[in-house]
């Protein structure tokens, strides 16, 4: 199957891919995948919550929203040294990228210098850096880039026409605007969504269509399977057919051939066999470590054993990322623009 990079996909084309027999869809996705990646290599990231809980948003899936009683206790922003210690552990375990997440609607300008210090120190360990901090304005995005940030994660979560069923405190366009700010300063984008929230296949098509028709495909596309947390509105939602999840991975791979397609939240509940199908469908990235922000993730030893059984190996740093212009000196700590989106 052709792996020409396209930005003009249609909903009809994506529906046609979803409607293929699963063996045929897997074959097409694997063919595209092999044109751009070594199928035996998996990029490994670790995600750390550097500021947990207390988020003012109402995302129906999120245990960190302060309005839901989920047992998550709000915490302050971690100290830089503690974050660096976690990053060292992640590197020793085989991670090549370290992502720092904060439960904010958007960061305050006063928080940016400390985040910038985290980025510089983690970068100095030889790791790629990623951050997910909520909505950014252009000035904040530039400050993070100047600190050496490689990737910024900001998911669109779902399709535009299902979005209002899940979130009311932030508009879909707000998410697209943040992605534009991130692209404008030259940061790489990490953007995906969540499935299993009660959406239909049409909504899953809409999510992938949004991603595949962005001005530039996300460099990383995290595909999350809903982790149902007691106390959140989506707790008790009917679970998604595992084969439908595999189809989601395969269509993401076909429509965004050069993107890293990441198995993200929900992997704890997946069998080894289901994960293998996802790798065959074009997934080539995972989150490593026992926790993803506040939810469980497979233990490192389990992932290492799975890699060994399947003959997979961790991917080394991507050259086009590690050779980016990096500034390890002074960061723009005193941000020129003072309004926060």
UniProtKB/Swiss-Prot annotation:
Annotated catalysed reactions: (4R,5S)-dethiobiotin + (sulfur carrier)-SH + 2 reduced [2Fe-2S]-[ferredoxin] + 2 S-adenosyl-L-methionine = (sulfur carrier)-H + biotin + 2 5'-deoxyadenosine + 2 L-methionine + 2 oxidized [2Fe-2S]-[ferredoxin]
Gene Ontology MF, one: 2 iron, 2 sulfur cluster binding
Pathway the protein contributes to: Cofactor biosynthesis; biotin biosynthesis; biotin from 7,8-diaminononanoate: step 2/2
GO BP terms: biotin biosynthetic process
Keyword Zinc annotated: no
EC number, UniProt record: 2.8.1.6
Ligand binding ([2Fe-2S] cluster): 99, 130, 190, 262
Cofactor(s) this protein requires: [4Fe-4S] cluster; [2Fe-2S] cluster
InterPro entries with a match to the protein in the record: Aldolase_TIM, BATS_dom, Biotin_synth/BioAB, Biotin_synthase, Elp3/MiaA/NifB-like_rSAM, rSAM
Pfam families to which the protein is assigned, alphabetical: BATS, Radical_SAM
Alphabetized UniProt keyword annotations: 2Fe-2S, 4Fe-4S, Biotin biosynthesis, Iron, Iron-sulfur, Metal-binding, S-adenosyl-L-methionine, Transferase
Free-text remark on how the cofactor is bound: Binds 1 [4Fe-4S] cluster. The cluster is coordinated with 3 cysteines and an exchangeable S-adenosyl-L-methionine.
Binding site for [4Fe-4S] cluster: 55, 59, 62
Domain annotation Radical SAM core: ranges: 40-267
Disulfide bonds: none
Highest taxon above the source species: Bacteria
Enzyme class, first EC level, given as a word: transferase
SUPFAM superfamilies xref list: Radical SAM enzymes
Function recorded in the entry: Catalyzes the conversion of dethiobiotin (DTB) to biotin by the insertion of a sulfur atom into dethiobiotin via a radical-based mechanism.
Subunit details: Homodimer.
Family in the record: Belongs to the radical SAM superfamily. Biotin synthase family.
Record-given protein name: Biotin synthase
Natural source organism: Xylella fastidiosa (strain M12)
Chain's gene name: bioB
């Amino acid at each position: 199957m052709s792996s020409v990079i396209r930005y003009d996909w249609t909903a009809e084309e994506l529906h046609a891919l979803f409607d293929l027999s699963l063996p045929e869809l897997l074959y097409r996705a694997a063919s595209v995948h092999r044109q751009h990646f070594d199928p035996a290599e998996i990029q490994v990231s670790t995600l750390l919550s550097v500021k947990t809980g207390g988020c003012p948003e109402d995302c129906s899936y999120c245990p960190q929203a302060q309005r839901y009683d989920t047992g998550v206790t709000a915490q302050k922003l971690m100290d830089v040294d503690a974050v660096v210690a976690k990053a060292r552990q992640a590197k020793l375990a085989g991670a090549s990228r370290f992502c720092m997440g904060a439960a904010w609607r958007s960061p305050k300008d006063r928080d940016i210098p400390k985040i910038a210090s985290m980025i510089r120190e983690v970068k100095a360990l030889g790791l790629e850096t990623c951050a997910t901090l909520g909505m950014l304005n252009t000035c904040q995005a530039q400050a993070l880039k100047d600190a050496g940030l490689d990737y910024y994660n900001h998911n669109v979560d779902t399709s535009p026409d299902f979005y209002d069923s899940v979130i009311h405190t932030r508009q879909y366009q707000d998410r697209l605007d943040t992605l534009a700010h991130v692209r404008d300063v030259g940061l790489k984008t990490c953007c995906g969504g969540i499935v299993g929230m009660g959406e239909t296949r049409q909504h899953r098509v809409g999510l992938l269509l949004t991603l595949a028709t962005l001005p530039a495909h996300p460099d990383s596309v995290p595909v999350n399977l809903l982790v149902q947390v007691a106390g959140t509105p989506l707790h008790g939602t009917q679970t998604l057919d595992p084969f439908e999840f595999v189809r989601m991975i395969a269509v993401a791979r076909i429509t965004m051939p050069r993107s890293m397609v990441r198995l993200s939240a929900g992997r704890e509940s997946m069998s080894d066999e289901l994960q293998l199908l996802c790798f065959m469908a074009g997934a080539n990235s995972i989150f490593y470590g026992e926790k993803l922000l506040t939810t469980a993730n497979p233990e490192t030893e389990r992932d290492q054993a799975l890699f060994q059984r399947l003959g997979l190996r961790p991917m080394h740093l991507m050259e086009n990322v590690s050779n980016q212009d990096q500034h390890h000196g002074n960061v723009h700590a005193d941000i020129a623009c003072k309004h926060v989106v």
